[in-house]
Amino acid sequence: MKTSLQIAAEAHLEPIGVIAERLGLPTEYLEPYGRYRGKIDLTFLDDHANRPRGRYILVSAITPTPLGEGKTTTAIGLAMALNRIGKRAVVTLRQSSLGPVFGIKGGGAGGGYSQIVPLAESILHLNGDIHAVSQAHNQLAALTDNSWYHGNPLDIDPDRIEIRRVVDVNDRFLRQVMIGLGGKQNGFPRQTGFDISVASELMAILAMVSGAGAKAALRELRARIGRMVVAFRRDGTPVTAEDVRGAGAATVLMREALKPNLMQTIENTPALIHAGPFANIAQGNSSILADLVALRCAEYTITEAGFGADIGAEKFFNLKCRAGGLWPDAAVIVATVRALKAHSGKYEIVAGKPLPVALLQENPDDVFAGGDNLRRQIANITQFGVPVVVALNTYPEDTATEIEAVAQIATAAGAVGMAVSNVYAAGGAGGVELAKLVARVTERPGPREPKYLYPLEMPLAEKIEVIARRIYGAAGIELSATAAAQLATLTEAGFGNLPICMVKTHLSLSHDPKLRGAPAGFIFPIREVRISAGAGFILPIAGTTVTMPGLGAHPAAHQVDIDDDGNIVGLF
């Protein structure tokens, strides 16, 4: 089979104005960025507030292997398949970070015959949103240090300057650095570091803005940025972006980034790509604003949440839907035979290395043995009152007995049904079975009532424990002395009613990436607690948090080049 880049190069692309018409977006709200990309003027939401909302479909997954299970590819393929059966559909996705693109994970734009095009434009810069986030973030960091340097009128504790610089690249050498060296004219020395750009709280803020129109969204962006905690004073009180007088400039830098980006799939289905927070360290969902636009335009909006249902989907319900006044009509859980076999605990999948030979051999018993993970993830979504469909992303080595094993696991666990998906190799045609099942499930009239996991007024520690018990399968939580003190301080400071955004590994339902399947009875440890006051959530941290990825021995960047005609080669 051809590479994704080769397939993308041969695709027939429609001008972005045609895609806007196909979406149902009046062209006066389209701001073209070249021939095949555009941004959407948010006055559309002001002028079309009375348009009925379409159906809303969440795409999630089982706990993934390091290779991923094709969730984005499935979401794109489902939207294309719905169009094939006569439903006007759109897919909403997060924007790719350049770090993983040139690292090892890939671009997050699908693959094969189920991808976003033009591929290179979609994963390399797009319309400049990540640059805007980076610039605004680093401006805030500079203003924070500048306030400390010029007499420190805010009494900033230099050991508690929280904001670090960001850059959109995987570079472990930047995790810990010394700045301010070379004498007083260059500042004061202190230890800090860099995070990858999409780990910036500004990216989380961009995804959480829910204003019902252009002016409302801009006001909300400005207010959220102003609440960002950039440092602490010597007395322990927070210093905000407003305090360092940087919120206005940051908002100016991000004002265009507030507008969702319009692109297309390889079958010319509209795609909205906007915001890109990671799911293991932030909320891991595309923007509320993009979904609000999509729901006012299309009959079906397909949106993807990062990693497994225990992470991205839980945050989708408790954070994104709560903030945006949204609720899905159905959810799709993507599974693969190879991942379920891996959850049996018998196989080790390592990114960048060949799959174990035994993993590719027929063995339905191992599928059943690893099926507990699928069962748990189905339960994780059905407890929100949302019907679940399982999409089996198939590979050539999958056998009929293994596929039947997945179907039995899915239906016994409470899924409405399972559909085989082959969108990577066959495009929308390979997702028609899934599209028909999703359309049938969403036929019930009227919106579904939100069913959150916890009320906001519940104490912070109890909210954390509810997630650990009901989503992860833990027997309880253990707060370190530091975490307990931080929770008390946050509650006393008036942040006790904020929702929870857990920070944990995506490779296990637990805090331990080595625990496969559906572990139970463990104690979930909370090492420390942070706050994203601008994004509007509390961040309990389990285990080690890496906010600046590193490169492997053979990063994807080694394969990327350009030919004499200007064509990119080796990207995917």
From Swiss-Prot:
Assigned EC number: 6.3.4.3
Pathway the protein acts in: One-carbon metabolism; tetrahydrofolate interconversion
Residues holding ATP: T65, P66, L67, G68, E69, G70, K71, T72
Keyword ATP-binding among UniProt keywords: yes
Domain of life: Bacteria
Keywords per UniProt: ATP-binding, Ligase, Nucleotide-binding, One-carbon metabolism
NCBIfam families on file: PRK13505.1
Descriptive protein name: Formate--tetrahydrofolate ligase
Species of origin: Chloroflexus aggregans (strain MD-66 / DSM 9485)
Originating gene: fhs
